[in-house]
């Protein structure tokens, strides 16, 4: 696993890097995330996933400050993070990106880690990167659930990873062209890992900082979602 470094992404590479951010009812949290990323010179694909609050208004307001950096796509209804990411992946191809990153909209990821997850791609050591959260800092319920999902990802997809449910990942354009994401909901995290493994895409794991708040702890993969993912994995194993 790649440790922390002082690597800096060149401005030319920043201009060719697109950060996909799916957002659902994040009006109170998303603004500082996208402003910080835009200030760093990265491009941003925002997918408003049918939010019922003022998320879309916030996105449009920030877009006015960074019209050359921010691009907004919207679902009329909430379709889930998996389909929101599919929309983001389809949209980003229009801009001919060199690198693509995915982070969450709620501020649980440190934008300072963008350069760290990009470093293996720019250095040519990998075509995909998985951001790994610290298990010791993770709330116990999430720690247990994530550990179980790591085991299931290994059993059903044959891949050993330290954090199968992370929402912070990156890949090259060539890697994106090779994978096919069809998952709905949070299964996208495991499906992403399955796709890079099935397509022999070299990947690295990079440690990332995670900022836990009551709001971020309440989101993500819970027991009910985990059971749904398990049955989907079984179906893939038997019929794909």
Which residues make up each language-model segment?
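Short beta-strand-to-loop acidic/aromatic patch adjacent to the donor-nucleotide binding site
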Residues: 97-108
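Acceptor/aglycone-binding surface of glycosyltransferases and processive sugar-polymer synthases
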Residues: 75-94, 111-186, 212-230, 234
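Short, well-formed alpha-helical segments that are part of the catalytic scaffolds
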Residues: 4-8, 24-39
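Conserved donor nucleotide-binding strand/loop of the catalytic core
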Residues: 45, 56-95
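Hydrophobic targeting segments
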Residues: 15-21, 30, 36-37, 43-47
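Short beta-strand/loop segment that forms part of the nucleotide-sugar
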Residues: 21, 42-51, 73-75, 103-105
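Acidic helix N-cap motif at the loop->helix transition within catalytic regions
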Residues: 28-32, 53-62
